[in-house]
Amino acid sequence: MKQTLIIGTRASKLALVQTYMVRDALQSAHPGLTVAVEHITTRGDIILDRPLNAIGDKGLFVVEIEEAMRAGRIDLAVHSAKDLPSVLPPDMTLAACPRRADPRDALVAQPGMTLAALPSGARVGTSSLRRACQLRALRPDLTLVDLRGNVDTRLRKLREGQYDAIVLAAAGLKRLGLDGAISELIEPDVLIPAVGQGVIGVEARADDEEVLRLLAPLDDQAARIAITAERAFLARIGGGCQVPVGALAHLEGDELLLRGMIGARDGRMVRGMQRGSASDPVGLGCALADELLDQGGRALLAG
């Protein structure tokens, strides 16, 4: 049995907080196990002067970490699941999905400010085509401005007055202890979140049976079922950073409820919701994707 595991992660404050959560869970599940952390710089960390969708759409924050796993430098990787491509390389697997945090988007602005109350022309920062598309549909009078950098950098730019408001993932703010910065939690029926938002995705080599066994206790069934449906939806559409796509699933007893959206950059979009058996999340994800593609999503993707 392995006595030491090495986790690979990006070096941002949020990535490290999430990695330490996984490290602590591993050591709690396996007393005596030593877990080390290696920082890895990805292409998405280096290129900060262009919007994400202008760089490329496959694994911007993932590829270099996977290469370190293949080389044997690390045993597993911790990601924000929303950064993972919809289909992993055949030699990699999503080995564990710990319990999901708040999947909603959060408005960060003056205390008490809401999305509905933002004044016309307000400058709203976001790096996400998904958020921008839905915001344009909801509030075409807002001025949307690209926003890059880690959470601290984004908050600093807001304080400096470069933006009137910014939209970030609530889970990241909460994990960093920045709940107080949130002026409004935006419900999923207003802004459908990114696929996997709020989930920590633990990736490992598909053939590393010992690491997979060690990670098994960290997997949360509800998170696994939900993200499987969401990722099936995304894979069916073929979406990445260059396509405004969102999906959120949650369990209601034995049923799984899945919301999804496909959009265009100008704010046109199709949205929908389906229920299905929790025993077939892939089928539900594909069914909703097919429905939205047939209802106009295919034309939106074609431009």
Curated annotation (Swiss-Prot):
InterPro entries: HemC, Porphobilin_deaminase_cofac_BS, Porphobilin_deaminase_N, Porphobilinogen_deaminase_C, Porphobilinogen_deaminase_C_sf. One of its GO terms (biological process) is protoporphyrinogen IX biosynthetic process. It catalyses: 4 porphobilinogen + H2O = hydroxymethylbilane + 4 NH4(+). Keywords: Chlorophyll biosynthesis, Porphyrin biosynthesis, Transferase. It comes from Roseiflexus sp. (strain RS-1). PANTHER family: PORPHOBILINOGEN DEAMINASE. Gene3D superfamilies: Periplasmic binding protein-like II, Porphobilinogen deaminase, C-terminal domain. Its cofactor is dipyrromethane. The gene is hemC. This is Porphobilinogen deaminase. One of its GO terms (molecular function) is hydroxymethylbilane synthase activity. Pathway: Porphyrin-containing compound metabolism; protoporphyrin-IX biosynthesis; coproporphyrinogen-III from 5-aminolevulinate: step 2/4; Porphyrin-containing compound metabolism; chlorophyll biosynthesis. The porphobilinogen subunits are added to the dipyrromethane group. Binds 1 dipyrromethane group covalently. Tetrapolymerization of the monopyrrole PBG into the hydroxymethylbilane pre-uroporphyrinogen in several discrete steps. SUPFAM superfamilies: Periplasmic binding protein-like II, Porphobilinogen deaminase (hydroxymethylbilane synthase), C-terminal domain. Monomer.
